[in-house]
Amino acid sequence: MTPPKTPAFQPLTGLYEPSAIQQLPDGRFLVVEDEKSHPLSLLTISADGRVDHTALTPGWLQLFSDFWALDDLEGLALDRAGFVYAVTSHSRDDDGDEKKSRERLVRFRIDGGRVMDSRVVDGLKSALAARHPVLAAAARIRDVKAGGGLNIEALEMSPDQNRLLIGFRSPLHDGRALVGSVENPSGIFESNEAP
């Protein structure tokens, strides 16, 4: 008897606008979405192709934490120590306004179905703008999509695990995407250093 074929493509029910996905050491997948009400989800894909989805939500003591005030998540990275890093777009909203919830870099762990050891860093946008005139000019653009305003799209840990690499959707430089780096990820989360 031939085993049933697992479809190559399946709908991911419960996910609406995924922006990034990161496989965790235990085989599950962490997905971030551009959804304020449920920005983080865990997916498990079983051997038979079944997909189980669990939205990560704050515990009672985390309800008012800045960590859960994340809007427009775009990138995920994982380090060897098991910390997950996530970044929001740092872009202005559709009205051209700046919002703290869109300008966050966070670090946390996943323990079972819970977020643990969460930390939030604000000030990445101002640090990038202070060091790079192209990014400073882009940060002033109110119409991000049409005008090439500052917009982070991706995050990755460097191969040596010492830096966080940030991929920008915009601005472009000579028609090419920019990649920036945070040189001190441990320091900003553990010692309150500036990015």
Model-derived regions, located:
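Sequence/structural signature of beta-propeller domains
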Residues: M1-P195
